[in-house]
Amino acid sequence: MINIDELRSYSNIKIIGHRHADFDSMVSGYLLENIFLNLGIKAQFVLQDNEEDIFFKEKFIGRKRTWRKRSDDVLFLVDHTAEYDLPVVGCFDHHPEIAHIEKNYINEPKTSCAKVIYDWAQSIGYTVPNGYEVLTVYACYMDSLSFKSTKARPEDLEWCKEMMRKHNMDENEVVNFGYGLTPKTENFAQYIKTGVKTYPLGDKVIKSSYIVVDKDEEDENQIVATLSSEITKKTVAWCFIMSNVIAETTKILLVTQDYYLVQTVDKLLSRGKNIIPAVMTFLSAKNDGTITKMLIEKQLEIATMESCTSGLIASNITDYEGASAILKGSCITYSNETKILAGVRRGVIEEYGVYSPETASEMALTTKMKFMADIGIGITGSFGNIDPKNPDSVAGVIFYGINYSQEENPIKLVYTTPNMSRKDMKQKTVDIVLATLNAMLAQ
């Protein structure tokens, strides 16, 4: 229940969405500001961050508000229920968690927070202006399509269709916008740095950006070349994320000073909840026996099939006490023939090539099944000169797969540091593979 008379008694209400406000948070904030002002409530929507979605600002609002906190501020929250060191006088939300907000609190499981606010306005007889009605449609589609929200309700989407007819909205435009597709710009560097955020990693930082697309068409080499120039002593890595909302895949490209990694996952992942925590664990990992200890603690058995690393992954695992309890076995399959003898299907090698993500995946699955282990690691690639038996090989390009649980998405590793010795490259590869396993086990 919202007590309008009580809210009118405040002189400085700040309406705020969650940090790094998404589209729904911003629509909710601007919509509620419009309603409150017309009800005689002194309120202003402000952003907690210095960032605002450029497309949102240019297409719909054309203004930017950054919050400069004052001691006499009171807060009205939209699209979240975080705690603050200032009084909270109310909240609209649409998440399943019920917060301990004692008054002026409405939390309903609707497709978007903006729809919760819109429905409340209708219930008190307030007529929402056409422009904000349109924004609410966009907010509902953004949450329901782009992120496959579990909060999406069929009745809300039916309402959206009714509003689209009312306002003569182009359905294709609405749906495409609902997918959250990143608008192309002529400036490629600006395009792939959409949504830049910085994350602390000890005394260093990781930077990340993302784009949302409906088809994979971006040039990997161009992305790496652009982001490599951003790597410094302070910024140790850049995590670029490309979400394909049609194929429902997420491509992750992690660029560091010496190498970059590419992985495509067969589902849409959250940057904040899924990707960045794993990246931070990966970059923080040390080859100090942690993996062996984790496998022992979790009672997980592992097997490896190694080509270019020549058994060094298994060797590193057994450098630490207790490895006999978790390492089931290891195969060094340095040639195509030995891979086939070990159980890798000839057709996979012939169709995709021995140096490919498909072959790495096949190696991981094969060794896992052969040794009846919980985890299988497969690795293939070239550290040096072109392999005469495999002329398509590229020096410094490695593929590895880790078959664990029901999901396995192979990773491409490319070294970008010239003149790195074969020995150093081999050990670095082992460290990277074990760090990847560490991040998987830590989830």
Predicted regions: what they are:
Residues 284-443:
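Short alpha-helical segments enriched in small residues
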